[in-house]
Amino acid sequence: MYQHIPTAHSVRKFNFLLLAFVLFASIFPAILPASVSASSICSAVWDRKTIYTSGQQASYKGHEWTAKWWTQGEEPGTSDVWQDLGVCSTNPTNPPDPSNTPPTVPTNLAVTAKTSTSVSLTWAASTDDKQVIGYTVYYNDNLQAVTKTNATITNLTPNTTYTFTVKAKDNQGLESEASQPLKVTTDTDTLPPEPATPCRPAGLYDSGVKNIPYCQAYDQDGREKLANDSKRRIIGYFTSWRTGKNGQSKYLVTDIPWKSLTHINYAFAHVDSNNRVSVGSPTDPTNPALGLTWPEYPDALMDPSLPYKGHFNLLTQWKKKNPGVKTLISVGGWAESGGYIDENGKRIASGGFYTMTTNADGSVNQAAIDTFATSAVDFLRKYNFEGIDIDYEYPTTMNQAGNPLDWQFSTPRLKGLMTGYNALLKTLRVKLDQASAEDGKYYMLTIASPSSAYLLRGMESFQALKYLDYVNVMSYDLHGAWNEFVGPNAALFDDGKDGELIKYNIYNTPQYGGIGYLNTDWAYHYMRGMMQAGRINIGVPYYTRGFQNVVGGTDGLWGKAVGKNCPTGLTACGDGATGIDNIWHDKDENGKEEGAGSNPMWHAKNLEKGIAGSYLKDHGIVNPVLTGTYKRNYDSTLVAPWLWNAEKRVFLSTEDEQSIGAKADYVIKNGIGGIMIWELAGDYDWYKDRNDGKGEYHMGSTLTKLMHSKFLAATPYDASNSKTPLPADKLALKIEVTGFQLGDQNYPINPTLKITNNSNLTITGGSVIEFDVPTSTSAQFSSYGGDSVKLISAGHTGPNVGGLKGNFHRVAVTIPTWKSVAPGQSIDVSIVYYVPISGPTNYTITIDGKKYAVTDK
C-alpha cells in the first residue's frame, strides 16, 4: 500500500496554515462552528411562518442554525441561507453530546377518531440511544408537541384534508426524521347544527311547537320590536283600582302616556277558586275591568260594539290607536298571590298560586296548572291581550317570606314551591306557543321577580327564567317598614354602609366578598346568569317608602326606626310613616292604616316644595297642614334621592328626574332591555292652575317621557348571552343544578351539579366542564364532596360600591381521573358558593384535549 511521507516543505506549509487559521479564528470567532463549545443551548425552534434576518438564530433537529440573510419558510439544512452552528441542548445542565444520534422514525401512524374539527392519532414509539422525551405532530404548516404516542389535534376546519407527520425528540434536543405522511379529512359537524328558528331570542326555551310566529314580535337578531321608536322597553303597570269612584284622583286608560311606552301591564287578574285566570264577574257593573263606565269624561266613553265595559273596553280602543304598544294581563300581586278580592271587597283566602301549583305534600299540582294555563290562553284571546305576566309573591323556600295572610298555604308547601313554579312557567310557555302557532299571533310570557338576595336564596338557581320572553325585576322595596333599617327604596348601587347588611355582618364576612346585595345593580347581575342583558328589565318605583321617628343616620339615611304596632304575623318591624306622609297606604284586616310612608311621587314633590295639595282631604287627611320642612337629599353613589323632615324625623325615599335619568343611562350603558314602572299613576307633572291657582304637582308623565327621550337615542339592547365564542362542536349533556337545602338551611349554598351524558362519546377521567356564573356571588367556589371545583377567572372581586365590574366568573369542574361517564350514565358534583346566582350558563366540556360546547338536544 502506498503511504505518503511528508517532506520538510509540506510540514512547514501545514504549520503556516495552522497558525494562520488560529489567528483568523481569534479575530473572527463567530464564523467557527458552535460545536467547538460544548455548552451551546438551543434557541427557539425554527418556525416556518417566522421571518428571520441576517444573524438571527433558531434551533432545528437538535442543531443551532443562524440565518445568513432574510428568509421565511426555508427549512434549515435544505438551503444555503442557513449555517449549521452544531449540536445544541435544550437543557443547560445537560450539554450536547456530539456522539448522540437522533431517535428512530415513528412508525404505524394511524387515526383513532375524528370529528368535524379534530383528529385523534396514534403511532408506535421511537427508540433512542439516550431517552425519547416527546413527539411533534406536523400538519399543514402547524405543529403540536406531545409527550405520549397519541395526540388529539383540535380547532381544525370541517370537511378539510390535512397531512400529518410525526417526529420524535430526545433529551439532547435531537429530532428524528418524519414519519410516513398520513392524510385525513375531517368530518362535517359533530352534531348537525340546530335548525335556525327565525327571530327567536337566544336562550328562550324551545317548546318544540312548530310555526311559532316569533317574527311578529322579534327581528332577525332576536330583539323585540318596540313601539314609539324606543330602543329599550318602557313597561308601565296600570292598576285597576284608581277609578275615581271613591272620590280620590282617577287614573284611567286615557291618562296613560301611550306615545312614551312600549308595554302596558294591567294589574291585576287573580287565580280564582277553580284555578282559572279571572278579573271577577263579567256581569257586575262595579267591576273595574269589565263593568264600570265613566260617562262624565268625554274621552273615556265606552265602545258599545264590544261585549264588555270597564278598563278593558278602553284598553281595546286605545290599543287600536297605538297598535305597536303591547298589552299584557298581570296575575297575582302582593294582595292576590294567595287569594283574591271578591266583588264585595272581601279577601278570599283561596290559596291562589300556592295551591294551584303545589299540593299539600309538596308535589306538583299539574292538573290545576293545566287548567290555569288553558284559561290563560282563553283569557288572552277573549280580551285581546298579547301576553301574560305572572306576579307570584313569592315561590321561595324562605319561610314566611310573602304576604302573612298567605303563610297558611306557603309554609306546609315550602319544599315543593319552586318545582311547582317551574312547572307552571314551562306549561304556560308550551300552551302559549301552541296558541301562537294556531292564531298566527305571538303571545308573550313574563314575570315580575323579586330582587332581594334573601328571597332569591330560596329560589334555587331560577331555572324557570329560560321560559320567559323577559323578566321584570322588582328592584324596589329593598328597604321599608317591615324592619327597622332606614334606607332607599330602590338604590341603583351599594355604598358599603347599608344598615341592614352591617347589622348581619355581611360586609365583613369573608365568604360574601364584601358584596352588598340590596340594590338594582346586584339584582341585574343575578339575572345575567340565565338571561342576556336584553331580556332583563330593571324596575323603578313611582311611589315612596318611608319611616317616622327615625334615630341616627345622615339626614335619616342608614338610621333606625323601630316599630311598636307590627302587622299581623310580624314580631318586629319598622315604624312606617303615616298620615300626610302615607296617602297611598294599605289597610289591615281591621281597616286600620298601615304605616309605610307610601305616596305617589307627585305628592312627594309637593311635600318637597312645601305645598299642601288640594287632594289631601280626598285621602282622609282631615287637617292638611304641613309640619316642618321636607329637605331633598341625593346620594350619587347610591343614585338615590330622599326627603328628610328633621322636625318630624320623617324619611321618605323618592325618585325624580336626576335618579331616573341616571338609571336610564345605566340601562343604555349595560345593554339592558329596559325599565319597568310600578306604577304609572305615581308619575308627575306641574299644573299651575290647580290648588286654587297656586299650582301643584299631580298625576303626569314627566319621568316616563324622560326615559323615552333617552331610549330614542340609545343603541339597540344586547341580544347575546356570551361575549366569548363557544366551540363549534357540540356534545349532548343534560346538566341539572339540584339538591338545594330549604330556606335558611341553604347557606352556604351547596347544590349538586348532576351531569348526564346523552352523547355517544364516553366522558373520560380528567375531563373538564367549564361554565359561567354571575358576579352576584363572590369569586369563591369549592366542594363539600371533595370534587375538583376551581375558579378559572373572576369577573369581580372585592366590595361592589358603585357597581359590579364584570358579568361572569368562569368556573371549572374536573371529573376524577379514575372515573369515566359512559353514554347514558350520570355523575354528581358538589358545588359550594355563598351568594345567590341564576344559571350557570355557557357550558363547555373538554375530553382528551378536545373542547365541545354543551347542548341539551
Where are these regions (language model features)?
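Glycan-recognition patch characteristic of GH18 chitinases/ENGases
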Residues: P192-L380, A572, T578-E608, S614-Y615, ...
